[in-house]
Amino acid sequence: MKSRRSRCRRSFTTLVRREEERLARWALELARRGLTGEARRVAEQLFQLAASTRVRPPRRVKRLFCKNCRTPLIPGLTARVRLRSQGGMSYTVVTCLSCGWIHRYPYRKGPRGGAPISPPAAEYGSGGRDSGEREDKGPQGPPRQGGRDNRQGGGHQGGPKGD
């Protein structure tokens, strides 16, 4: 049987986490509407609540905000998201468009065409639960066009030397 203190602490932690997620959703909604100043204020309240109660927000909530200016990071609106490989490691690079702060989050590459090992970059804007599985089991769409090998004009066209 669990002690009363551990039961109380668990319910307290649950209440604080619920409030943190509510504040995160509210800040994201304000940022989507273009009220970034208000969204920053709500994000500051979220992190003040976490510090005063000593209940850390989950990683997925912390990564929704810039560590420097507390702007909610929404891809295409307040953040730029890129996937980079460097020195055998792969990173999701998130750049805050408000202050220019760069966040690098390492991830492991999964098998091609299989389920991703780390959450996709599109999940940054969603505050939903991470189920661990993709909802859509179908193909991921047509392959990307363009890139270094598919550029038109200029460069070597693959013929014999001396053409």
From Swiss-Prot:
Pfam families recorded: Rpr2 (PF04032)
Disulfide bonds: none
Job description of the protein: Part of ribonuclease P, a protein complex that generates mature tRNA molecules by cleaving their 5'-ends.
A GO biological process held by the record: tRNA 5'-leader removal
UniProt cross-references to PANTHER family, sorted A to Z: RIBONUCLEASE P PROTEIN SUBUNIT P21 (PTHR14742:SF0), RIBONUCLEASE P SUBUNIT P21 (PTHR14742)
Gene Ontology CC annotations of this record: cytoplasm; ribonuclease P complex
Protein name (record): Ribonuclease P protein component 4
Protein family per UniProt: Belongs to the eukaryotic/archaeal RNase P protein component 4 family.
Needed co-factor(s): Zn(2+)
Assigned keywords, A-Z: Cytoplasm, Endonuclease, Hydrolase, Metal-binding, Nuclease, tRNA processing, Zinc
Keyword Hydrolase assigned: yes
Subunit comment: Consists of a catalytic RNA component and at least 4-5 protein subunits.
GO molecular function (one): zinc ion binding
